[in-house]
Amino acid sequence: MLNFELITTDGNARRGRVTLNHGVVETPIFMPVGTYGSVKAMSPLELNEIGAQIILGNTFHLWLRPGLDVVNAHEGLHRFIGWDKPILTDSGGFQVFSLGDLRKITEDGVTFASPVNGDKLFLSPEISMQIQRTLNSDIVMQFDECTPYEIDGRPATHEEAAKSMRMSLRWARRSRDEFERLANPNALFGIVQGGMYEDLRDESLAGLSELDFHGFAIGGLSVGEPKEDMMRVLEHVAPRLPANKPHYLMGVGTPEDLVAGVAAGVDMFDCVMPTRNARNGWLFTRYGDVKIKNAAHRNDPRPLDESCACYTCRNFSRAYLHHLHRVGEILGARLNTIHNLHYYLQLMREVREAIEQHRFADFRRQFAADRARGTQ
């Protein structure tokens, strides 16, 4: 099930509420990524404490390891990973297409060599729907081909992007048909493709709208294209998505990208950036970014962000985080991840409040001014 309530708007920015089988999600929302069934360096308890409402699981990786038999023995992903709130799973398409020369695409689906042991495997819209039914995720994504920005070292042509998008549309219908055949009680999202071409994005959305998905995602962005192209496509597509359905921007991005996405009409975001950057010592704060390995932090007694109420900022100095990073302590990665995810989730809390109070434009200006202090 999925129920979407649009509470209020401020320009194109939307304040909404998504009710799913495992709980309610207040939007706009950022969704931490748990590729293998865990958000790296975080326990479910810590995710709850920082206010995570929904997390991502990766269909492709969970299918390969631990395998569906293991997840099925736990009656789904929620019990297996000890998380009782909503979960969104991607379709596995992006990971398969990332394999490059190791895979072969046909109308039926994709044949590829397992990155785990080299076994020959096949993934199709039907198989993706079957895997996601076993995972029992609250939001299921259609199986699609993520149109690359570059093909053979040059931007994809209109013809190449059109061919890819139209196959994704045919796969969308097959995904929906299999989802319904399985009597899946959860929600299914369609994915708008079309590369950097607005007319192809419009064609994709028109085709998906006929299939009446529970929600709509924008795919194929943040795949290597210049930022101005990403924003051009985002600002074209997001306001055109059905107003009565949730809007999800896949795999994006920086704090600035999230705020720009909200301004365009996006409700849901995911990205590995806050967790991956945390492990590499790159931290996001209200007043710009912090590279904790820099020598300037060696004797700094201040918290990362004096305006932040996360466990890391309440208890530890920049000097201590610098020390942990320099000596390679696991605790450093954990404390950094707690902070970065808290920052992203707090940013979304402030965005929701600003939309409710119809001051999102002012919020956006202040956000940009604060973040413009740059990297320390």
Swiss-Prot record:
Keywords: Glycosyltransferase, Metal-binding, Queuosine biosynthesis, Transferase, tRNA processing, Zinc. InterPro entries: ArchSynthase1/Queuine_TRR, TGT, TGT-like_sf, tRNA_ribo_trans-like. The active site is at 90 (proton acceptor), 270 (nucleophile). Residues 251-257, 275-279 are annotated as: RNA binding. Pathway: tRNA modification; tRNA-queuosine biosynthesis. Gene3D superfamilies: Queuine tRNA-ribosyltransferase-like (3.20.20.105). One of its GO terms (molecular function) is metal ion binding. GO terms for cellular component: cytosol. Its EC number is 2.4.2.29. It catalyses: 7-aminomethyl-7-carbaguanine + guanosine(34) in tRNA = 7-aminomethyl-7-carbaguanosine(34) in tRNA + guanine. Its cofactor is Zn(2+). The keyword Transport does not apply. One of its GO terms (biological process) is queuosine biosynthetic process. SUPFAM superfamilies: tRNA-guanine transglycosylase. Substrate binds at residues 90-94, 144, 193, 220. Pfam families: TGT. Binds 1 zinc ion per subunit. Zn(2+) binds at residues 308, 310, 313, 339. NCBIfam families: Q_tRNA_tgt, tgt_general. Catalyzes the base-exchange of a guanine (G) residue with the queuine precursor 7-aminomethyl-7-deazaguanine (PreQ1) at position 34 (anticodon wobble position) in tRNAs with GU(N) anticodons (tRNA-Asp, -Asn, -His and -Tyr). Catalysis occurs through a double-displacement mechanism. The nucleophile active site attacks the C1' of nucleotide 34 to detach the guanine base from the RNA, forming a covalent enzyme-RNA intermediate. The proton acceptor active site deprotonates the incoming PreQ1, allowing a nucleophilic attack on the C1' of the ribose to form the product. Belongs to the queuine tRNA-ribosyltransferase family. Homodimer. Within each dimer, one monomer is responsible for RNA recognition and catalysis, while the other monomer binds to the replacement base PreQ1. This is Queuine tRNA-ribosyltransferase.
